[in-house]
Amino acid sequence: MRITISGPPGSGTTSLSKHLAAEHNLKLISAGEVFRQLAREKGMDLAAFGELAENDPSIDLMIDARQKQIATEQDDIIVEGRLSGRMVEQADLRIWLNAPLTCRVGRIAFRDSVTCEEEAMTLTREREASEAKRYMMYYQIDISDLSSYHLVLNTERWSVGQLGLIVNCAIAAVRD
């Protein structure tokens, strides 16, 4: 079983991926965690690191190539990342999560300990614009085109556990 979980920042991809990985005993490969770790290692915030990635394609290409490689070599995995649904060609289930911008910004502000939601809003918009530009430039992928996903969920009103129940129905259907 190969599952991809994608979505914009703050939509809950990491939380749901961790939940499902634990529940189904699947290995989790997370592009966002790799990206955040690289930013921390360079002593940069995500917006600044995103700007660096715009000028240094090797950052995105390295993360994406690693996810693609793991997905071709392993089974029983969840690959979480903005482009994982496009990069993992042999995925059994491709999921896209979303939520209204204000909801996502609130989650990001909480997660990243940003006290000013206006600052979080600005950073989120900049990050999303930066990512959309890079994905189009590197891969000719329009991140707003969701046609390759099997399941698209708005996460605003559901807890991680409730989202897990919804996705479990899809997993059961794929396994049958």
UniProtKB/Swiss-Prot annotation:
CDD domains: CMPK. GO terms for molecular function: ATP binding; CMP kinase activity; dCMP kinase activity. ATP binds at residues 7-15. One of its GO terms (biological process) is pyrimidine nucleotide metabolic process. It catalyses: CMP + ATP = CDP + ADP; dCMP + ATP = dCDP + ADP. Keywords: ATP-binding, Cytoplasm, Kinase, Nucleotide-binding, Transferase. SUPFAM superfamilies: P-loop containing nucleoside triphosphate hydrolases (SSF52540). Its EC number is 2.7.4.25. It is an enzyme of class 2 (transferase). One of its GO terms (cellular component) is cytoplasm. It is found in: Cytoplasm. InterPro entries: Cyt_kin_arch (IPR011892), Cytidylate_kinase_dom (IPR011994), P-loop_NTPase (IPR027417). Belongs to the cytidylate kinase family. Type 2 subfamily. This is Cytidylate kinase. It comes from Methanosphaerula palustris (strain ATCC BAA-1556 / DSM 19958 / E1-9c).
